[in-house]
């Protein structure tokens, strides 16, 4: 289910392309839920800037896939189907997992907090009915910025940090994960 980093398009995506890609992801999510009738993990990489499909985002994505599969295996959950694809909005992963949706979301939240790359992953858990379980369902605060203690959404909206600084931080986190041999 991994994506080859060397095949990244490095295409600078436009806002209309990004919106179409997100609509297409929602349609894929709906199709998966209809097909499996089980919770769905929909997984992407937090990718600031216009280039969403890069060697960097694919390497971060591949770590996430490995970590998600390890979580499912450790919990004894069956993965009915898994797929990875590269879209205009970057790498996307889908895993239909036979597990209680709430437990699955708690496990992905823990993964986002414990793994060196967890802050760079956007892991959504959808119930079989199509409801997205969010951090708010568990009274958790909004995600923090990669570079400061502000809300990530506030910094992104205000373009508080230079794109180059964000990418350097992402590279450093990936280096740390690679160096510690953590999947």
Curated annotation (Swiss-Prot):
The keyword Transferase applies. GO terms for molecular function: holo-citrate lyase synthase activity. It catalyses: apo-[citrate lyase ACP] + 2'-(5''-triphospho-alpha-D-ribosyl)-3'-dephospho-CoA = holo-[citrate lyase ACP] + diphosphate. It is an enzyme of class 2 (transferase). GO terms for biological process: prosthetic group biosynthetic process. Keywords: Nucleotidyltransferase, Transferase. Its EC number is 2.7.7.61. InterPro entries: CitX. Belongs to the CitX family. Transfers 2-(5''-triphosphoribosyl)-3'-dephosphocoenzyme-A on a serine residue to the apo-acyl carrier protein (gamma chain) of the citrate lyase to yield holo-acyl carrier protein. This is Apo-citrate lyase phosphoribosyl-dephospho-CoA transferase. It comes from Citrobacter koseri (strain ATCC BAA-895 / CDC 4225-83 / SGSC4696).
């Amino acid at each position: 289910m991994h994506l080859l980093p060397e095949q990244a398009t490095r295409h600078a995506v436009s806002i209309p392309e990004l919106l179409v890609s997100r609509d297409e992801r929602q349609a894929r999510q709906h199709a998966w839920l209809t097909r499996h009738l089980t919770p769905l993990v929909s997984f992407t990489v937090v990718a600031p800037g216009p280039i969403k499909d890069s060697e960097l985002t694919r390497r971060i994505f591949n770590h996430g896939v490995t970590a998600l599969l390890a979580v499912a295996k450790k919990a004894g959950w069956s993965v009915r189907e898994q797929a990875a694809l590269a879209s205009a909005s970057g790498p996307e992963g889908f895993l239909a997992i036979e597990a209680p949706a709430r437990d699955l979301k708690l496990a992905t939240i823990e993964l986002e907090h414990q793994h060196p790359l967890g802050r760079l992953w956007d892991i959504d858990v959808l119930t079989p009915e199509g409801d997205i379980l969010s951090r708010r369902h568990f009274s958790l605060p909004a995600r923090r910025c990669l570079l400061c203690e502000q809300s990530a959404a506030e910094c992104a909206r205000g373009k508080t940090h230079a794109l180059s600084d964000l990418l350097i931080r992402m590279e450093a986190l990936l280096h740390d994960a690679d160096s510690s041999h953590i999947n």
